[in-house]
């Protein structure tokens, strides 16, 4: 069989047989990280794709460059001739496009339901967990690619090596993040699943019950077939608690001795980490991951667990980790700029939960031990700020200098006592760091930076809101990055 014939047959495997009646798919909120990737994969399958978003962005521009019609603003006429609407949790039920679809009896499906259809007829691998999903999904995708398995992937961030967050591969594999924030990962029925950790986040979805959140993860793992595989972090106390209830094949990973896959002899080397992985029935394997932090060693172990089970060679695993160039906004180095007799390094990170922020701080200390750590932090959602208030106080007090932006609401209404001013006051009372409130709209960010930053500082922009755009602006227009 010629390579061309094989590729064409592989493409046929990607088709969704039961969606043959669907020609035109419209995405409401197409600029979202989870939405745009699915839209691009479906467009590459030959479906007509359109979408709308409230604001233009780099993402919507890229979608248009790829031939997808994007409307800025939500209007009923945008859905003309659509056969189905795909919506994210963030979309208001009163959205005019949603209301028009209801009136016209056009099916409305959630993002994860459409992802589930993509996964239904393939060898699906879903990566779940409160933290680390994007990096773990990216690592596993890279390992499969190094073995020339050419997976389809849908990732919540830009894979730096490809410049995109989704692509249609020619093999039976599809790797995707499984989102627990709205419990929509229950739509997925993968062949293999990873759970990186379980932590208290998005608790409004689970009526404030952590037990209900854990129950939902058990239900997710039971979406696996009886011959599937769950690869879970055995170091996580909440995962260990639910394991007796999981009636599927399980492999555990972590640093503890009782795990099936373990990392030992970890050495930290600037922006890299070296470790030896132990797997049952295999020789020890010394590896280097081109990312700092113990949390990234755990992410690598998760990917190794699935990759090994899928037949990826040790050589491909090693190449993937050593050459891994990271994911957009995951400890992403933006560059350096001169200040006095030294320089300041600018790093941007998406982490927005206290445990994610703490992991980033540890990675920053590990990779740049001689630099003072200045953090520009933007809390994400009033509800998370309220629910994790004490944890934020403890974690944010670990930096040398803290600059606080106002809470990014993500569609939420303000909650009394869950704003940045109250958070700053509580951090100040703890007495370890003196936070500075910043309103970039007033144009005082640059002035404050000039007064706060010192030669050889590490400036870390942190959060899931528009602080990432501020980081890019600092890099491109103000800080003269080399």
Swiss-Prot record:
Any one GO biological process: peptidoglycan biosynthetic process
MF GO annotations: ATP binding; UDP-N-acetylmuramate-L-alanine ligase activity
Reactions performed catalytically: UDP-N-acetyl-alpha-D-muramate + L-alanine + ATP = UDP-N-acetyl-alpha-D-muramoyl-L-alanine + ADP + phosphate + H(+)
Annotated positions binding ATP: 129-135
GO cellular component, one term: cytoplasm
Entry keywords, A to Z: ATP-binding, Cell cycle, Cell division, Cell shape, Cell wall biogenesis/degradation, Cytoplasm, Ligase, Nucleotide-binding, Peptidoglycan synthesis
Subcellular compartments: Cytoplasm
PANTHER family referenced in this protein's UniProt entry, alphabetically: UDP-N-ACETYLMURAMATE--L-ALANINE LIGASE, UDP-N-ACETYLMURAMATE--L-ALANINE LIGASE-RELATED
HAMAP family referenced in this protein's UniProt entry, alphabetically: MurC (MF_00046)
Protein name according to UniProt: UDP-N-acetylmuramate--L-alanine ligase
Species per Swiss-Prot/TrEMBL record: Acinetobacter baumannii (strain SDF)
Source lineage: Bacteria, Pseudomonadati, Pseudomonadota, Gammaproteobacteria, Moraxellales
């Amino acid at each position: 069989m010629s390579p061309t014939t094989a590729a064409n047959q592989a493409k046929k495997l990607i088709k969704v047989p039961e969606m043959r009646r669907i020609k035109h798919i419209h995405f409401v909120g197409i600029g979202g990280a989870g939405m745009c990737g699915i839209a691009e994969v479906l467009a590459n399958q030959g479906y007509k794709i359109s979408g709308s978003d409230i604001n233009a962005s780099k993402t919507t521009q890229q979608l248009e460059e790829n031939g997808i019609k994007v409307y800025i603003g939500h209007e009923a006429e945008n859905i003309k001739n659509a056969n189905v609407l795909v919506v994210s949790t963030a979309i208001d039920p009163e959205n005019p496009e949603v209301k028009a679809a209801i009136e016209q009896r056009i099916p409305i499906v959630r993002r994860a339901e459409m992802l589930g259809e993509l996964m239904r007829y393939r060898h699906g691998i879903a990566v779940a967990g409160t933290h680390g999903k994007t990096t773990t999904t990216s690592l596993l995708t890279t390992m499969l690619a190094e073995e020339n398995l050419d997976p389809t992937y849908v990732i919540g961030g830009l894979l730096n090596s490809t410049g995109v967050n989704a692509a249609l591969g020619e093999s039976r594999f599809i790797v995707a993040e499984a989102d627990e924030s709205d419990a929509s990962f229950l739509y997925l029925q993968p062949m293999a699943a990873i759970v990186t950790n379980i932590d208290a986040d998005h608790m409004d979805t689970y009526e404030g019950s952590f037990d209900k959140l854990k129950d939902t993860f058990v239900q997710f793992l039971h979406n696996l077939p009886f011959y599937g595989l769950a690869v879970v972090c055995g170091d996580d106390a909440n995962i260990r608690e639910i394991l007796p209830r999981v009636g599927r094949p399980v492999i555990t990973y972590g640093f503890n001795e009782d795990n099936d896959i373990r990392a030992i002899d970890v050495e930290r080397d600037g922006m890299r980490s070296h470790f030896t992985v132990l797997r049952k029935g295999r020789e020890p394997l010394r590896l280097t991951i081109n990312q700092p932090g113990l949390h990234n060693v755990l992410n690598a172990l998760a990917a190794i667990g699935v990759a090994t089970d899928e037949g990826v060679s040790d050589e491909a695993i090693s190449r993937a980790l050593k050459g891994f160039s990271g994911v957009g906004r995951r400890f992403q180095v933006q560059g350096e700029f001169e200040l006095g007799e030294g320089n300041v390094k600018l790093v941007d990170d998406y982490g927005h939960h206290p445990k994610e922020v703490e992991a980033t701080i540890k990675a920053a200390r590990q990779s740049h031990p001689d630099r003072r750590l200045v953090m520009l932090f933007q809390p994400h959602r009033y509800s998370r700020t309220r629910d994790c208030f004490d944890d934020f106080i403890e974690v944010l007090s670990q930096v040398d200098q803290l600059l606080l932006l106002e809470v990014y609401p993500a569609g939420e209404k303000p909650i009394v006592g869950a704003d940045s001013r109250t958070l700053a006051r509580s951090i100040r009372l703890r007495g370890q760091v003196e936070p500075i409130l910043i309103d970039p709209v007033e144009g005082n960010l640059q002035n404050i930076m000039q007064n706060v930053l010192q030669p050889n500082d590490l400036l870390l922009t942190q959060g899931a809101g528009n602080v990432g755009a501020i980081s890019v602006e600092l890099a491109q227009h103000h800080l003269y990055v080399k």
